[in-house]
Structure formats: C-alpha cells, structure tokens
Amino acid sequence: MADERMRELFLSGKTTDRAYRGETLGKLYADVRAKKNDIVGFLAGDLGRSAKECAFIYSSMIEKPARIAAKKDWTKWRWLAPVLPDFITTGRVYRKPLGLVLIEADSREPFLFVFPRFLASLMAGNPTVLSFGGRQTKTGTLLTELANAAIPAEFGMIVSEGEEIPMEEPDYVFAEEYPGRVCAVFDGTADYDKGAEKLIYAWRRMEGLNGVKPEVIYCPVSMRSALVKQIDKWARRSPDDPDGRKVPVIGVRGDEELAEKLEAEGEMFALYMFSGEDTYALRVALDRPYKYASVNSVTLRSPSMKAYFNESVNSKTIMMR
C-alpha cells in the first residue's frame, strides 16, 4: 500500500531533510516555470480573463508558492494576517511535521486555493495526499500532472474525485467541514454594538444554511457585553424559541489565547467576524484550521476567485515581477 511506503519514508526522517525536500519540490518548481506559457493560457481559458491578468495570477498563486516550497526552509510560524502573495501561509497548521496528511478539499473550493496548501504540507515534511473533488479545469489538470510526475508517490500525490485514495490510515485529515458546537469571533470593530449585531445576523443565517446551532460563543473580551446584548435582542424577537437563543458568551484575551481555547475544544464550527482592515478579510479567507462563515457578514461560503483577484488588484497587494 502507498501509505505503508509513506510511513516508512516519514519514519526514516528523510521528508524532514531540507536537501530532500529541496530536490523534490525543486523539480516541481522547475516544471511549473517551464510550463508557464501553457499554464497562463489554460488560466485564460478557465477564468475568461486577459493574458496579462492570468500572468499576474500565475506569478502570485502558482509560481511563488512553488518557489517558496522549493527554496525556503520552514520558518517559525507567526500569527500574521497574510496577503495574497503569501498564499503558502495557508499551511500554518503544518508548522511542524504531523506524519501522514490527507487533505480533503471542499468541493466548492477552486484548485488554486488548495494547491499551495498541498505544497505547504510537503514543505513541513509530511507525506501528503490531496484529494480534490472540485470542478476540474485545464489548469488544475496540468498542475496535477506536473505534481504527480515530479514528486515521488511515497512523498506526495494529488488524486481527483472518483480515484482511489491511497492512504488508509492518515495521522491528520485536513477537511473543510468542521461540524461542532463552537462559534468564534476573532476580531471586532471599533463599533462593538454594530459588529455584534452583524455577527448575530450572520449566525442566524449560518444556522439556517448549515443546520449548526452554536452552544458556546468565544469572542474577544472587548466584544462580550455587546454580544450578550445582541443575543438578548434576538431572544426577545423569538418568543417561540424555548431556549431564547441565549448561549454562553465567553470572553478570551487575544488571538493566541482564543486560538488555543478553540483547539482544546476539538471539532467545531467557527464563525469569524471581520471588518475594518482588508487584511482581516484576507486572513479569514486564508486561515484554514477553522471553517469560517462570514466576512463582514456578507459571505457564508468559500470565497470566490473573482473577489480575491479584484481585492488584490485594487489594493496593489501583489506586484507583477
């Protein structure tokens, strides 16, 4: 079985050797560069965008993550709000070797969003299988072929929907669906009452869409009183609800402490509330240990590629090289 060979490779310590990773991922990086024109052409066909825009997308979302994975050693993880060129930071959950990793991508998630996460897992020294069940595109098909040709099967591979997953006993399954009981707020606004109102509205919509009813809300200490007030408002608006929509609201100090609290809860559904700086919106879209439901109470599903591209172009967070 492939996972037996993966286990042997991981236990040998070879996957955590920088030279081995550099050689393996370096070949993929070289192939990605060699196929630049083909990839840009496929992007133009898949996305219906100009060649100039697709060159920009290739540079930031394909070539740069591949270069980082091939040429840089895994650095100490930092809690920073990443911008789009730093897409490799989606792998922050892989800041240390975990063993055999299975990535089960959400069916709504574009291939360009999961490919850097696959590279990040390999970069951390994890034998990794990416199971992609989303819409097949020419770009995704080409990148899959390049990855599977360059990376030894016992180190990593990409399989499409319908193909057999050659990993029966992974140490870590990275999936997009996190059923659970926790609703978490990582950042509020200066106007806490308004932010809390948006949060409760998004939560109500989320419950209707996903069937998730949070039993606990963790939030920054500064937002606690505003959230309690908004929950009380919803309770008064829903007299037929036996529990009055009231749930415990626990204030936690700081992102780090809040993240540790959520990790201790195990499986969960985390509802993020972001507003204000654009970097917060980017972070909620890129951080993957917890599934998000709302960015500024607008979207309750995986972000669209168009939103990413427009945001990047308008704010000039990516520069063409």
Question: Positions of the model-derived regions?
Answer:
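Conserved C-terminal structural/oligomerization subdomain of aldehyde/semialdehyde dehydrogenase
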Residues: E8-K27, L102, L130-F132, A202-R205, ...
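ALDH superfamily catalytic-core signature
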Residues: L146-I151, P170-E256
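Donor nucleotide-activated moiety binding/catalytic core segment of transferases
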Residues: F87-L102, G162-M167, G244-K246, A264
